[in-house]
């Protein structure tokens, strides 16, 4: 174990339009090479597309999508007696949010739509409707945890 102090968790400021910390975290997840203004443009135009397609408040659709993607369990590899076990563990609140936003952006990038804002909008809508790649990832993670439930007693 490291003897250094653990790094302090910095406060993330809420974004100016939706006044939400989660939206800022999503912008930071979308951002590549430090180009935050481009990431903001992508997200805000994606929210406009969500509003156009669903006729609902994009923030509500987004929070529903994140809620549907959020994992409860995950698999951690633990080495005991020369054998690696896949141990299911509960996910902390911060990691739940980070994973859900990461999966949302990851599977939006893998889509075949024309632009990133369209891909992201479609992935958010799909996640809110409990379909799409990010939901499948969550289900696969939960299935793996369920399959390895026998090793749950190896927890940290």
From Swiss-Prot:
**UniProt record, GO biological process:** translation
Function noted in UniProt: One of the primary rRNA binding proteins, it binds directly to 16S rRNA where it nucleates assembly of the head domain of the 30S subunit. Is located at the subunit interface close to the decoding center, probably blocks exit of the E-site tRNA.
Enumerate the Pfam families for this protein.
Answer: Ribosomal_S7
Record's PROSITE patterns? RIBOSOMAL_S7 (PS00052)
Q: From the record, what ranges are coiled-coil? A: none
Q: Which GO terms describe its cellular component?
A: small ribosomal subunit
Which species does the entry assign this protein to?
Answer: Mycoplasmopsis synoviae (strain 53)
One GO molecular-function entry? tRNA binding
Q: Enumerate the Gene3D superfamilies for this protein.
A: Ribosomal protein S7 domain
* Record PANTHER family: RIBOSOMAL PROTEIN S7
Q: Which UniProt keywords apply?
A: Ribonucleoprotein, Ribosomal protein, RNA-binding, rRNA-binding, tRNA-binding
Describe its assembly: Part of the 30S ribosomal subunit. Contacts proteins S9 and S11.
- Recorded protein name is Small ribosomal subunit protein uS7
Regarding protein family, the annotation reads: Belongs to the universal ribosomal protein uS7 family.
């Amino acid at each position: 174990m490291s003897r250094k102090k653990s790094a302090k968790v910095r406060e993330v400021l809420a974004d100016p339009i939706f006044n939400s910390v989660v939206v800022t975290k999503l912008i930071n997840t979308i951002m590549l090479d430090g180009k935050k203004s481009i990431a903001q443009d992508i997200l805000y135009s994606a929210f406009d597309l969500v509003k156009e397609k669903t006729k609902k408040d994009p923030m509500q659709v987004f929070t529903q999508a994140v809620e549907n993607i959020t994992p409860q369990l995950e698999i951690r590899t633990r080495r005991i007696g020369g054998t690696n076990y896949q141990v299911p563990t509960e996910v902390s609140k911060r990691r739940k949010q980070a994973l859900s936003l990461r999966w949302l952006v990851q599977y939006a990038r893998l889509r075949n739509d024309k632009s990133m804002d369209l891909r992201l909008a479609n992935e958010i809508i799909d996640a809110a409707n409990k379909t799409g790649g990010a939901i499948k990832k969550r289900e696969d993670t939960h299935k793996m945890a369920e399959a390895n439930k026998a090793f749950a007693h190896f927890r940290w």
